[in-house]
Amino acid sequence: MVMAVEDSVVRVVVRVRPPTPKELESQRRPVIQVVDERMLVFDPEECDGGFPGLKWSGSHNGPKKKGKDLTFVFDRVFGEMATQEDVFQHTTHNILDSFLQGYNCSVFAYGATGAGKTHTMLGREGEPGIMYLTTMELYRRLEARQEEKQFEVLISYLEVYNEQIHDLLEPKGPLTIREDPDKGVVVPGLSFHQPASAEQLLEMLTRGNCSRTQHPTDANATSSRSHAIFQIFVKQQDRVPGLTQALRVAKMSLIDLAGSERASSTHAKGERLREGANINRSLLALINVLNALADAKGRKSHVPYRDSKLTRLLKDSIGGNCRTVMIAAISPSSLTYEDTYNTLKYADRAKEIRLTLKSNVISVDHHISQYATICQQLQAEVAFLREKLQMYEAGAQALQQQCSPQPPTLSIPQSLSSSSLQPGPSSQSSTLECHAKNETLQEESLGSDAQGQEIVEESASEQEQCPQDKQCPTQKPEPNLPGSPSPSVQAKPGTGQHSPQKQDADHSKQLALQVLRLAQRQYSLLQAANLLTPDMISEFETLQQLVLEESVDHRAESPRSPALARGDPLAQALCSESKSSGYCGPVTRTMAKQLNGLTHTLGAPLAPDCTSDKTFQKPTKEKKRKLTPEEPGSLPAPNLEMKRQRQSFLPCLRRGSLPKAQPCSEPRTPKRERASSPSPSSRVCPATVIKSRVPLGPSALQNCSTPLALPTRDLNTTFNVSEESPSKPSFQEFVDWEKVSPELNSTDQPFLPSAPVFIFTKGRKPSLPAVTASKKRRTMRPSVSRGRSCIARLHSSTLKKPNRPFTVPEPPLSPHCLDDQRTPKGLTGVTESY
């Protein structure tokens, strides 16, 4: 038990009761004069003037004066007009704080019979005493601390009557007193009650007062014939358990002593006389204890506690570990002159009693049995936290695997989404992978040149998928591969989140996606180098058909997904020109570079655009790049004001859809052209006639060509330009011809008009039978190309054939060829976007 030691003294207050009607009738002079709140004068001198007509009775009417004009100083003096609340505020209200801190407290009222002790302690209806007020205040403070601490309140109520102890709450026979080394003075058999509220406690106090012994005497009509002791025990502890938990136990004693009386004044006889004698004996023992404690002044001396049962019960309250308040009740009348004087004398003597206060705090260190329970709780908490941490780490690993970044792949334009090439069933993925392996062998022998045509076709394929009533989003391209001017962007995986069970399927889709990208790049490289054979074209078309079927199924599930809109099937790439609104964007220098370098080799008819004129957007500044050191022949493009372009013959191309082309290192024609990258052969492999449509260049510096005369006949036919002396077609004049730069002077270079005009490459006429276009692709022999090219080629037998036949979709007839006898089937070598 840990105790905080504190020195204190007994606090003494004096209360002067009002005069009774009997005292007023006797016209006795008062012997008490209250000077201030702390001082009073006993038996003051009579004033010479006095009151006119008022004469005090002589000495024969009262006792002689003793200690005339005596002054007493106390901690507090209450006059005749003081209320019960005033007495409570300066007595028990102040010591309640110490009581809740674990200090024992005691309040007792001392005085002669009829001085107002019981009225001060118990009060009456409508004017409760200190016991009632203290109980209410105690419960109010306990409720204020209820959230922090747990409280347990016990009460007991006993009386000492004729030197016998009786229980007032449960009346029974006399009880004995025992000394306990730890608890001090105890009364075995005394009942303790635990009230649930302050009202219940007051009800118990009222019931005990009714059991108390009272008899009227001549001095007091309601004289108490016993000493009453009301005790309150409070045990409190913190609500949060722990090793530092402390248990506080305190006791408060509210004592109403019986008044000393004189037999001559009370005229007591028989039982009342014996009661009075026992009361006086116990009070005498109390006075002796007070004198012994006052004379000791901290020294060890004998204190006669055993002279009376009252002093034994009050051992802790008066001279022990307790904060004590003594209320001295006196009468102002001279009828009680001797009793008042004795009360003031003993009260003044009690002020000299010094006390040693100790706070009763029981440390939790002594409760070893709680350690095992606390250890079990801590172990359970550690196990729970470890399990929670493992679950968190497992979830983090799964999320990291799910959101792992894709490996570096080939650069593709932003307009192409990776989700458009994702295969569906596993059988199709295996077929695509087999085709891509053979194409990889061809790519290694060709290098990494001529990527411009690939991007042009991809842009055209993207424009097909956009619905006519909506505008396809245009994104700014960014260069990705060094040495390649083609704008590209890294492919992004699907935005959908997959569960861990679908990781295997996602891995297969990603693998198939990489294979399709490789095949796409292979096709563009072969096409740009003019190394495609009919067998290769057939295999690539078969591969494109598989992707088309998967895109159609995937589009049916989520038609509004932006990623599906980028999957461009082959059939839509050759849609009718009548369904397109034409290319309305400006022809940039980058577009002219691509077409200037590619159309000399292959004239690739690009797919028409499916967007309307209302959805065109202005080109971004990123489209106009600066000249690189690899293009010394390029001249700076003139600054042209932004304006709305006329309908171009390339409806599949929107603004920003044509990426930059790979520059060539060797001239493909005798005319002045841009340099291209090295190629195994300087000659172009002649093939069947391929007609192409390219946009109008902004100036001759960009197209490196001179204007030609417009043809006056329909051009939607098949021409053979491999003859020795091809005829030079005539051209009609354009409406916007004055907008073309005057630098277009030479007539021996290809020209990019703004109206539908076809540009053809020169070559010798192939000796092939006049059959349909699809039959020509299948029956063409590699020897025809080998006779006119020095580039090493792989024989068509080394390429793996598709598992199923593929039919090249035929484009619809153009309105310009309705009066022509020939059909578009005569066109061969048409390139489709992949």
Curated annotation (Swiss-Prot):
Phosphothreonine modifications at: T431, T669
Entry's transmembrane regions: none
InterPro entries: Kinesin-like_fam, Kinesin_motor_CS, Kinesin_motor_dom, Kinesin_motor_dom_sf, P-loop_NTPase
GO MF, one annotated term: microtubule motor activity
Gene Ontology CC entries for this record: astral microtubule; cytoplasm; cytosol; microtubule plus-end; nuclear body; nucleolus; nucleus
Compartments, as annotated in UniProt: Nucleus; Cytoplasm; Cytoplasm, Cytoskeleton
Subunit structure of this chain's protein: Interacts with MAPRE1; this interaction is required for efficient accumulation at microtubule plus ends. Interacts with KIF2C at microtubule tips; this interaction increases the affinity of both partners for microtubule plus ends and is required for robust microtubule depolymerization. KIF2C phosphorylation by AURKA or AURKB strongly reduces KIF18B-binding.
Name of the protein in question: Kinesin-like protein KIF18B
Lineage: Eukaryota, Metazoa, Chordata, Craniata, Vertebrata
